[in-house]
Amino acid sequence: MSTVMIVGATRGIGLELTKQYSEEGNKVIACARDMNAASQLDELASGSENIRIEELDIAEALSIESAASRIGKDSIDSIIIVAGYVGGMPENQTIDNIDIDEWHRTLNINTIGPLLVARAFKENLSSSGNGNLMILSSQLAASTWPMGGMYVYSTTKAAVSKVGQILALDWAEDPIIVSIMHPGWVQTDMGGPAAEITAEESASGIRNVISGLKKEDSGNFYKWNGEIHPW
């Protein structure tokens, strides 16, 4: 069995990934930004010996470093960074009403945070001998998906996709596979009830992709169903 770390495990895709991995007997380090807002995760963990909850706020460098210190040198086979932020009024954003402070906040969560997590836990992934780092991005990050508005979310996800690609190049000699994932349009708090797939379907697809990755796949951008997503 593997050890999997889920960053952003309190709800939606992250919670479902925690559920699926733990039910198969894997050890899951489930990371929550706010321990007081993790009731669903707490309930899931109470019925499983395989789930360890850790506080990790991806927007705060000190929180990431503290989590890394608590986890220590334990080997981690896969890290899936689910945590993200849509960045206020996404459907109504225009060049005239963008909140620049909100843009900075979203960049910190969606782009800089995943880079800091990668840096903090690189040795944990390396020690597994075949580590996987998957960063959830979005189809809205792709130049092949032209869509107006949503400046804040789209640009910060485009940036983190590039972060993933660069990490794959820089870690080419390390035993770590880096991948970028479009999880689908998912029925979560962010995606809404009209979305195309459930969190269960998305999580299952993500797990299938990870299980089939090889080193030569590092740097690829995937859809939840296993297809390569064009950049």
Predicted region positions:
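C-terminal helical subdomain
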Residues: 180-183, 192-231
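Conserved Rossmann-fold cofactor-binding substructure of NAD(P)-dependent oxidoreductases
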Residues: 59-73
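N-terminal Rossmann NAD(P)H-binding glycine-rich loop of SDR-like oxidoreductase domains
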Residues: 10, 14-20
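Catalytic loop of short-chain dehydrogenase/reductase
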Residues: 85-107, 115-116, 122, 126-172
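Structural signature of the Rossmann-like NAD(P)-dependent dehydrogenase/reductase core
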Residues: 6-7, 81-82, 131-138, 177-182
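Rossmann-fold cofactor-recognition segment
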Residues: 45-62
